[in-house]
Amino acid sequence: MKQTAFYQQRRVLVIGLAKSGFAAAKLLHELGAIITVNDQKPFEENKEAQQLEQLGIRVICGGHPLELLDEPFDLVVKNPGIPYTNPMVKKAMEKGLPVVTEVELAYHISEAPFIGITGSNGKTTTTTLIYEMLREGEKRPLLAGNIGTAACEVAKKAEASNWLVTELSSFQLAGIRDFRPRISVLLNIFDAHLDYHGTKEAYAQAKANIFKNQTNEDYAVINADDELVMQLAENIHAQKVAFSATKVLGRGAYINNGFIYWNDEAVIAVADIVLPGKHNLENILAAVAVAKLAGVDNKSIYQVLTTFTGVKHRLQYVATIDGRKFFNDSKATNILATQKALSAFEKDSVILLAGGLDRGNEFDALLPYLHNVKAVVLFGQTAPKIARVAKQAGIETIEYVDNVEKAVPVAYQLSEPGDVILLSPACASWDQYKTFEQRGDIFIGAVHKLK
């Protein structure tokens, strides 16, 4: 492992546990740091804190006492979900303490190069595609970050011959100092997490941090169809590699005459790809670009794209019941994701299940995508806002329910054979559910109860 000596005897404050904070605390302990862990959840209910205390780590739970920062810490590692406006984090920064996230630790200790994937939508699908292509091409990839295992846990085991394929959120990227991926991917930028970042500009800048430390020895895979992405990449040092679902580029990954091309070579016919949804073509193009940069052969890419059907909770087919098809798109935590989901069913009659956490967004951008939606079933804090837009779109059937579980039988009663019943909330889940996965699993369970 690189840079392990740096942490020996360093006094480190870890703020916030959950998966990434817990992994960071364990790693720092192994590296010989003197750690204090601080978490909001009371100790009696906090399994992670209890486990860390058993390792001999100092644990302070039940709040974030500002006086803790009067102690002489060298570094603060914060859980990515804790915003920079948090009083504890603000005080640490005012004191001039470095404040980083667990991904930074992973970079410091990893022998393997990173492939970092970010964007408002499509991160998980693209990350999974890249991992599968590199695995098929025998490039020894390891999957890390927002998918599955915390990055620093994976980085501990990584060797120089591996690739660390890492999904990165704006929360993680906002706090990087040294992190430098060999290949970065910026898929798209859309208004998201404004409650965390404050403005779209701050959110976009956090995403653009993925390029911050790259040099001309590295690659940046960027979406030529997204104007803001291209602006953010204008002055970067990495070699730019574009992908486009709408333009014939000549270089990079693009579509021409029904084929996906890499530079001037046809890789696969679009008709042979089994992953549904036009929006997934962008994810596929980005993945093809990364795979080719990592040295994967066309045969391996073809094998993945003719067998990969998607990721759970992302436009996931659930069941057909009495001629109605049910799709779980619980990962649609913003408006753009729901636009793309509705575009995938533009020739179908759709009953849309939507709503969730109110982050201050309006939903007028959904209007052009509602022409084939015959009814909406709404839940959560944003239900009235989405209902207003549905009325503008001329949708007469608008139902309010308490939650996703109750939405499913209501949607079924409103439907006819041949209809698509689509959960695509356009909102985060946190007003009612811990995660979008929990929301999606409840939807799946409710669908199966109809059988």
UniProtKB/Swiss-Prot annotation:
Gene3D superfamilies for this protein: Mur ligase, C-terminal domain, Mur-like, catalytic domain, NAD(P)-binding Rossmann-like Domain
EC number: 6.3.2.9
InterPro entries (alphabetical): Mur-like_cat_sf (IPR036565), Mur_ligase_C (IPR004101), Mur_ligase_C_dom_sf (IPR036615), Mur_ligase_cen (IPR013221), MurD (IPR005762)
Pathway(s): Cell wall biogenesis; peptidoglycan biosynthesis
Record has Lipid metabolism as a keyword: no
One GO cellular component term noted in the UniProt record for this chain: cytoplasm
Reactions catalysed: UDP-N-acetyl-alpha-D-muramoyl-L-alanine + D-glutamate + ATP = UDP-N-acetyl-alpha-D-muramoyl-L-alanyl-D-glutamate + ADP + phosphate + H(+)
MF-aspect GO terms: ATP binding; UDP-N-acetylmuramoylalanine-D-glutamate ligase activity
Gene Ontology terms: biological process: cell division; cell wall organization; peptidoglycan biosynthetic process; regulation of cell shape
Keywords from the named record: ATP-binding, Cell cycle, Cell division, Cell shape, Cell wall biogenesis/degradation, Cytoplasm, Ligase, Nucleotide-binding, Peptidoglycan synthesis
Top-level class of the enzyme under EC nomenclature: ligase
Similarity comment text for this entry: Belongs to the MurCDEF family.
Functional note: Cell wall formation. Catalyzes the addition of glutamate to the nucleotide precursor UDP-N-acetylmuramoyl-L-alanine (UMA).
Protein's UniProt name: UDP-N-acetylmuramoylalanine--D-glutamate ligase
